Amino acid sequence: MILFSIFVALLAATRAQSQTPPGFKPSTELHLGVTFQDGVSVQAGHELLANEAKSAPQLDLHSLLAIHHTQTPFYHSTWKFMVFMIDIDVERNGTKYPLLHWYQPDLILSGRTGRLSIESDSNMPKAMYAGPAPPPGPAHRYVEVIFKQPERYELPADFEKFLENTIAARLGFDIEQFVKEAGLSEPVAGNWFLTATS
């Protein structure tokens, strides 16, 4: 835990602007690299077309490698991570609800490239990626946030219902409650983008 706290503190040295939308919790100023198909890279708060984000992105923590310039990676090689993507602007009867678009545990970090990939023997429950598809109207905010995965981690039972690939199942996902029940620390990094349907 001490090593992870030092890891987060050093990553904070790379911060520039907030990497999560105003008011979003848990917030972070640490940059998560998010690159969609055709090399479309997410810059915090910028707009993407829905078809640019229709497939799951490649994630990276290049900011970690920018801090640690030696051949030996600073992070511990046994660490795993989990990522979430959430639409925080789904409206029902005048009230906004968060919609889970993606939950992927068992991500491992390459110390050489800074890229995150799914552990080859992962059998953890997950929520398959669903691209943005907001209704016509104002742009929706899509937040990606990544956490260090605790050792001996298990998905909290209360959240199994959100894994089904339907809007009805995934609506109302409470990331703050998930963090509490899963015993997660503060986010390692985040990013977010806007998507609108004309």
Curated annotation (Swiss-Prot):
Origin superkingdom: Eukaryota
Practical application: Phomoidrides A and B (also known as CP-225,917 and CP-263,114) are potent inhibitors of Ras farnesyltransferase and squalene synthase. CP-225,917 and CP-263,114 inhibit Ras farnesyl transferase from rat brain with IC(50) values of 6 uM and 20 uoM, respectively. CP-225,917 inhibits squalene synthase with an IC(50) value of 43 uM and CP-263,114 with an IC(50) of 160 uM.
GO BP terms: regulation of proteolysis; regulation of Ras protein signal transduction
Glycosylation sites: 93
Residues in the signal sequence: 1-18
Homology family: Belongs to the tstN family.
Function description: Phosphatidylethanolamine-binding protein; part of the gene cluster that mediates the biosynthesis of the antihypercholesterolemic agents phomoidrides which are dimeric anhydrides. Within the pathway, tstNB is not essential for dimerization and its function has still to be determined. The pathway begins with the highly reducing polyketide synthase tstA that catalyzes the formation of a C12-fatty acyl-ACP, starting from one acetate and 5 malonate units. The hydrolase tstM is involved in the release of the C12-fatty acyl chain from phiA.
Protein name: Phomoidride biosynthesis cluster protein N
Organism encoding this protein: Talaromyces stipitatus (strain ATCC 10500 / CBS 375.48 / QM 6759 / NRRL 1006)
